[in-house]
């Protein structure tokens, strides 16, 4: 079976290859109707606050996951153990979707936005993760609880560092990525002090952070090098606030790079078929620059 634009959400969620986690492919908090199709839900009425949603992009992601799962590759990893999930059943609503790159290569952890109301992974983290894996990097897209987002991101980092050998990933010089609310998560956990406060193990700070369309403005000497982008027509995140933040990072001696795209609105994701298309290659180059320092 190959998923198409006419495949129903129910068919994807209940697919045997996605048993136990298929429901996490779509936003739990928005409760899409199971009889709607992939094409039906790929719009801003379903993924609220987002723009530039592409059915083709969603299908590329879903079919990649399906193909790998059918080859008996583990594509989903819970971040909490069974005892923790029994004590707090909401922790079952979390986990990492794995987009595999080269063995023993560095990893990226990507957080979709959704206003801390839902997790827009299918548009705002899965496509970026797939693109990173195609470049050879191991990429993990986090499904988190919107009201406990920072706790879940910290737990995800703990999990990846604790299981790096089994996952065949290199934990050093990892990167944190995020869009909108997910960008706030990446920025905060990319900060050395916040990382030490929130994680339970000794974890090195991220080598860099990717921050898409967020008006987060605070800076600290503990912040990570940052690549950021936004559109001029973003009515949620002001691009000038973002630009000023990165200028302030530079004043602190922290490497940063900012890109603004004329006419783009909030939540353009990977930017397919827009003036932002290809931004992810620039972000990867920025990451590689930090790695090679």
Residue ranges with predicted function:
Residues 88-100, 106-107:
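A short loop-to-beta-strand scaffold at the N-terminal edge of the catalytic core in hydrolase folds
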Residues 235-244:
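Conserved alpha/beta-hydrolase "acid-adjacent" motif
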Residues 121-140:
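Short amphipathic alpha-helix adjacent to the substrate-entry channel of hydrolases
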Residues 222, 228-230, 234:
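Short beta-strand/loop motif that positions the catalytic acidic residue
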Residues 151, 155-223:
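Primarily recognizes the serine-hydrolase "nucleophile elbow" in alpha/beta-hydrolase
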Residues 105-114:
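Short beta-strand element of the alpha/beta-hydrolase
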Residues 1-16, 20-27, 229, 252-293:
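C-terminal catalytic histidine-bearing segment of alpha/beta-hydrolase fold enzymes
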Residues 1-93:
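N-terminal targeting or regulatory segments adjacent to alpha/beta-hydrolase or S9 domains
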